[in-house]
Amino acid sequence: MVLTNQWYLYSAAIEKLVCDKIIGLGKEKFKKASIDVPVSRDLSAEERSSGIKPNVGVDESIRISDVVFLNEDWLFELVWPFIKEANVHAGWNYDIRSCESQQLTRYKKGGYYKWHTDGRSDSLSAYNDPSNVHINGYVRKLSLSLLLNDNFEGGEL
């Protein structure tokens, strides 16, 4: 497949008050972001149920940021129409059915995340976990970046 559009942009799609509400969801909950590396073996049931991922750690040569994962239905309902519309208007036309939990990322001055591919395909992938009933057996096809702060505060993608 040859894509003519690598990205799709909405400008000022969400009101500032809503952006501030989303930012507020992460207050006091942020943790230093880690990076995942592929695992070349299947996890045991005990490893999977523990929630502890082997080969996960902080590597500041690749990423300096803080994250919190959200599972807010109203936020999903807010962004899902944008995802579906972009999928069609950009000409991707992927078969998309659901979303992962929302990841709220905070970049302080000097923070970054080097070029990377979103999603995983190894045994740690959320898509390979049967408890994730809405996404099990699928793969991530699109990623959405929602910049919540004003341009003068940062927020370059």
Predicted regions and their residues:
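Fe(II)/2-oxoglutarate oxygenase catalytic core
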Residues: 1-157
